[in-house]
Regions:
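C-terminal PAP-associated
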Residues: 1-224
Length: 224
């Protein structure tokens, strides 16, 4: 686990055959014998963020989760081959419980107006809470805040997907769906739309959860 790394590459020009600037981020940022899993990225005008999960070694990712982190890098410096000022934000939690699988919200044109992240309780049989995490870039300081939003439509961990030859009497058969984490999100004009897998129809089938957050960058976002 101590050799776990995230490798980040910035192009020096718009010609991919020209040299690249390569940076290495430790997969054990807290120096506590953890490794990094499931990275995801988003961009703002000035920053690159990379989210990831920290995993305890020698156990499954399901039970070995030990917090999600956000790396923030300066893109201007990255494209110039300079000091990207890589900063990692950890211990992201709500009511003392880690917020898991932080999914970066991408701008509709791939550039985020505001760096934000979504999460949920992806292993719960039923839950109505979506977590909205906001990273505010500043010239001298960067802050991370978390809000819990309540949905009028609950979600739940999905069962395995049923295929034509699936034995429906055995819940372990079928296409494994893993869990109900948020796996897609975009923002535009102050709103966020996002999707995840979910249980549908008295937990009988796997379905798609489509959420909408209005006024997502305001102090009072609304989830439907």
């Amino acid at each position: 686990c101590c050799n776990s790394r995230i490798i980040v590459c910035f192009s020096s020009t718009n010609d991919p055959t020209d040299p690249w600037y390569i940076y290495s981020l430790t997969g054990n940022p807290l120096n506590n014998n953890r490794w990094t899993d499931f990275p995801a990225i988003a961009l703002s005008e000035t920053g690159l963020v990379i989210t990831a999960n920290l995993i305890i070694p020698n156990v499954s990712w399901q039970v070995g989760f030990d917090g999600s982190v956000i790396w923030h890098l300066n893109t201007s410096e990255g494209f110039a081959g300079g000091n990207v000022n890589a900063t990692v934000y950890t211990q992201i939690a709500h009511n003392g419980k880690f917020v898991r699988n932080l999914h970066p919200v991408r701008g509709h044109d791939n550039i985020s107006d505001q760096l934000q992240f979504l999460s949920n309780r992806n292993f719960d049989l039923q839950n109505d809470t979506i977590f909205l995490i906001t990273l505010t870039e500043g010239t001298s300081d960067t802050t991370v805040t978390a809000q819990a939003l309540i949905s009028n439509v609950p979600y739940g961990v999905p069962p395995n997907g049923k295929q034509g030859d699936t034995d429906t009497t055995d819940a372990t058969k079928g296409l494994q769906t893993n869990d109900g984490r948020v796996l897609g999100a975009i923002q535009k004009d102050g709103w966020i739309q996002f999707v995840s897998t979910t249980a549908h129809g008295a937990n009988a089938n796997a379905g798609i959860y489509h959420g909408f957050i209005a006024n997502a960058q305001s102090p009072d976002p609304k989830l439907t």
